[in-house]
Swiss-Prot record:
Function comment: Catalyzes the conversion of dethiobiotin (DTB) to biotin by the insertion of a sulfur atom into dethiobiotin via a radical-based mechanism.
Cofactor note: Binds 1 [4Fe-4S] cluster. The cluster is coordinated with 3 cysteines and an exchangeable S-adenosyl-L-methionine. Binds 1 [2Fe-2S] cluster. The cluster is coordinated with 3 cysteines and 1 arginine.
Protein name listed in UniProt: Biotin synthase
Keyword ATP-binding: no
Organism: Methanococcus vannielii (strain ATCC 35089 / DSM 1224 / JCM 13029 / OCM 148 / SB)
Length: 328
């Protein structure tokens, strides 16, 4: 392909993306481009929406393990055999201490709880913890608390915080990773939250054995739900999970770095105006290519994840700076 033709194709994709005219079949064709071409387009789309800053976020595993759901990738499920720390909801003091420790490095701090749902007592405790963090730090607070009901969503709306609820994968593929709750259960939480005016962060995991059509379907589901922030995770197959067994037995293949980058880029091209946030598994999958992802994303989770260790925070902040971006 000569340079003139390439530039014409870039411009056409760029303009289609800006105007929201990228269809599923277009996305599949665009993915045939070289990864560096996709990164080029993604970067210019970022610039078009003034996304020169990288919003950092961090999480605390506030309640760990003993989850009733059978998500085959999750080390916290009782249906898997991962060796993790199991504990109930941490105290207000512990969670506040964690928030303060990250305050100078992160824009957002999310309280994450294991399990399908939390009890009303736990929910009331978390509302108090939210107030404490908002009063004593400058962090924006988020929560990831499973399948929240309408009453809980209303209470969180009054606190003016963002909720997180991952769809994980496409509706069609979901039954391959979880059978103890329905895809629509998650969709309902997001829809109910949006109706109330809550900000929503949702996304999925690439590398669960899904095909590219499943990834595209997931992205369009997120687009149609109009979520504010798209959280992209890359599978880190944790020892003891059913997903790790599938990879060890060659039933499914681990996602390759270039494949992951292309999937991140198409997320930006489909939803150029949204926050595209790269989260868990980036160290494991992208390895030395992590910095390239910043050409497409404008959000980055830093610090440790739920049951796995993240990269050194200073290394991530230096990577952001070295790539010419600012923490925002």
């Amino acid at each position: 392909m000569n340079e003139r033709k390439l530039n014409k194709d870039f411009l056409e994709i760029y303009e289609m993306s800006i105007s929201g005219k990228i269809k599923k079949e277009d996305a599949l064709e665009i993915l045939k481009l070289d990864v560096y071409d996709l990164l080029h387009i993604s970067y210019h789309l970022k610039k078009a929406f003034n996304k020169e800053k990288i919003e950092t976020c961090s999480i605390i595993n506030a309640k760990s393990g003993f989850c009733s759901e059978n998500c085959n990738f999750c080390s916290q499920s009782i249906h898997n055999n991962s060796k993790i720390n199991i504990y109930g909801l941490k105290s207000k003091e512990e969670i506040l201490k964690s928030a303060k420790s990250i305050e100078n490095y992160s824009n957002r701090f999310s309280i994450v709880s294991s399990g399908k749902k939390i009890s009303e007592k736990e929910f009331e405790d978390i509302l108090e913890i939210i107030d404490e963090i908002k009063n004593k730090t400058k962090l924006k607070v988020c929560v990831s608390l499973g399948l929240l009901n309408k009453s809980q969503l209303k209470a969180l709306m009054k606190k003016n915080i963002r909720i997180h609820n991952n769809l994980e994968t496409s509706k069609n593929y979901f039954k391959n990773i979880c059978t103890t709750h329905e895809y629509e259960d998650k969709v309902d939480v997001i829809k109910n939250g949006k109706k109330l005016g809550l900000q929503i962060c949702s996304g999925g995991i690439f590398g669960l054995g899904e095909d590219i059509i499943d990834r595209i379907d997931l992205l369009y589901e997120l687009k149609e739900l109009n979520v504010d922030s798209i959280s992209l995770n890359l599978l880190n197959p944790i020892e003891g999970t059913k997903m790790r067994e599938k990879i060890n037995s060659k039933e499914i293949k681990s996602i390759e770095p270039i494949d992951a980058l292309k999937s991140i880029c198409i997320s930006r091209i489909i939803m150029p105006e949204r926050v595209i946030r790269l989260c868990g598994g980036r160290e494991y999958v992208l390895k030395d290519l992590q910095s390239l992802s910043l050409l497409a994303v404008d959000g980055l989770m830093i610090g440790n994840y739920l049951t796995t260790s993240g990269r050194n925070i200073q290394s991530d902040l230096r990577m952001i700076e070295d790539m010419g971006f600012k923490k925002g």
